[in-house]
């Protein structure tokens, strides 16, 4: 009976994943994430919590995964689309090589200023070129220039979901073969598994955009992908050709 019960339990866990409770999520944060989070990132996370749009910030669990990936890949030229207060940007700047550079674009300079003092305090401001711009305009300008095609080692996207597919078509040309693009919020609060009729109205527009992106990434022969249930979902894409 015990064996059968355990078998049923682990079959269900294998199918659905373990993170079915807030307690387990908090355990991971308390045991493995927060003890490893740098003091500068911790301060920025706390500062972001007082922002009225704090829910837009990168989760510390996703930030840890991002840092781990960057320290492994060691990209020297990266681009970040969507910055908000800069948690993921600071995590990137702390993780790439000393001579690494980040082009960061966001329309909201005020939100970026929340984290700027901590970016300076961490001593990594020189790695960052922050551009106040509509991201589509910047990406189109980079492609039109010609010098930037296939020049980036890594891209991170956490911006307006309505343009995720458009960003993908541009970033796939801007990252080099073997380079990586990471998209945040690709599970959209878990609603991607729901039929559209069950998605709350306030989430529906972005639900359409995120599910469309997921379908495209799942069938795009130009990339290998890993879609992970970390934070609000993060998808890593490696350009194959």
Curated annotation (Swiss-Prot):
Record Pfam families: Methyltransf_3
Domain of life: Eukaryota
UniProt: a divalent metal cation binding residues: 158, 184-185
Transferase found in the keyword field: yes
Cofactor: a divalent metal cation
Keyword Methyltransferase: yes
EC number(s) from the headed UniProt entry: 2.1.1.104
Entry protein name: Caffeoyl-CoA O-methyltransferase
């Amino acid at each position: 009976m015990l064996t059968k019960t355990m078998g049923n339990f682990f079959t269900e866990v294998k199918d659905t994943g373990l993170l079915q409770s807030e307690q387990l999520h908090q355990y991971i944060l308390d045991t493995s994430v927060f003890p490893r989070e740098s003091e500068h990132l911790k301060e920025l996370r706390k500062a972001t919590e007082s922002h009225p749009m704090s829910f837009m910030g990168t989760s510390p669990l996703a930030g840890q995964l991002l840092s781990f990936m960057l320290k492994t890949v060691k990209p020297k030229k990266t681009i970040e689309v969507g910055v908000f207060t800069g948690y993921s940007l600071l995590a990137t700047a702390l993780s790439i090589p000393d001579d690494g550079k980040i082009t960061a674009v966001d329309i909201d300079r005020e939100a970026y200023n929340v984290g700027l003092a901590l970016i300076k305090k961490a001593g990594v401001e020189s790695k960052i070129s922050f551009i106040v711009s509509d991201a589509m305009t910047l990406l189109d300008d980079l492609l039109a220039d010609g010098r930037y095609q296939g020049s980036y080692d890594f891209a991170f996207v956490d911006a307006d979901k309505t343009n995720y597919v458009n960003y993908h078509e541009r970033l796939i040309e801007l990252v080099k073969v073997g380079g990586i693009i990471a998209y945040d919020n690709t599970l959209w609060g878990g609603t991607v598994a729901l039929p559209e009729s069950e998605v709350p109205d306030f989430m529906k527009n972005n639900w359409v955009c995120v599910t469309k992106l997921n379908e495209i990434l799942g069938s795009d022969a130009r990339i290998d992908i890993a879609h992970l249930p970390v934070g609000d979902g993060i998808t890593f894409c490696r350009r194959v050709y």
